[in-house]
Amino acid sequence: MNEQEKFEKRKKITKYVLITISVLFVFFMLVMPLFCIVSSSLKQGLGFYFKSVSSKYVVSALKVTLFATVIAVVINTFFGLCAAWVTTKFSFKGKQVLATLIDIPFSISLVIVGLAFLMTFGRLGWFYPVIRWFNSVFGANVRIAFAIPGVVLATIFVTFPFVSREIIPVLNAQGKDEEEAAALMGAGGFKIFFKITFPQIKWALIYGIILCTSRALGEFGAVNALSKTRGETFTLPLEIDALYMSGTESSITAAFAASSILVIIAVVVLVLRNILEYRAKKKGQEQAAS
């Protein structure tokens, strides 16, 4: 056996060893736990499963979760686009500081985020006198901490970087030549964006929105500090925690049933992401070939 054959044999062995390690890791760390959640949710039968997922508290938690997710995705899509555009198309003092601040939700403990919002908008917070003045003047009953607005704010904070961080590399790779040429030919800002910029970033934007949605649906830490009323401000992850901590067999099974909702949503999001990646890759290959 010559050296080339030995090398090919070692390469083949290495390949199968790495494949085996990867498959086993994914199976034991991801597939098996998720399968256990689904199987545990059906432990007491389909009747109990549907009764659990349609209970008053679970339905309320799902509504709060979806509401906070939709608001967070809409706001973060807009401001994510703005932040990505500013940091890639303009030069200004503090640009690096802004780019660093965008990444703060990735590096800070989410429990601290919740406490920070609580100390800002709660009864002991510096912004609470403004809320109290507004309520007294307009006869309103606006609340942020321990209310839906607090849940929404925490979700927005946690999910802010996802859209901008997907778009920024694409805008950096795109450069400014096409946009500057269009501007010299008299095209306006909106026309340049929708005709030149948007077609090149749309897949990154959609991917960022999917990641933002997925992260918002599963948020627990920051929201936990700002939500206290079950059936009113609890999100689905908080409701799952409350059911599980009840300790009874039926409530634990109900917790797994509620968890299966998030598992199903996660699988749908994953499939959608892979479809979009495939379409983007295929379109890129077609453009390269032409």
Give the predicted meaning of each segment.
Residues 3-10, 48, 71-102, 115, ...:
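Transmembrane-helix boundary motif in ABC transporter permease subunits
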Residues 17-21, 29-32, 36-37, 94, ...:
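C-terminal transmembrane helix and the adjacent membrane-cytosol boundary/short C-terminal tail
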Residues 8, 46-54, 59, 95, ...:
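Membrane-interfacial helix termini and adjacent extracytoplasmic/periplasmic loops
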Residues 28, 63, 67-79, 83, ...:
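Hydrophobic alpha-helical transmembrane segments of multipass integral membrane proteins
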Residues 20-22, 74, 104, 108, ...:
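Transmembrane alpha-helices
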Residues 37-74, 89-90, 243-250:
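Periplasmic/extracellular loop-to-transmembrane helix junction in inner-membrane transport proteins
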Residues 31-35, 39, 78-83, 112-115, ...:
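Membrane-embedded alpha-helices of multi-pass transport/permease systems
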Residues 10-14, 56, 223-276, 290:
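Interhelical loop and adjacent transmembrane-helix boundary motif
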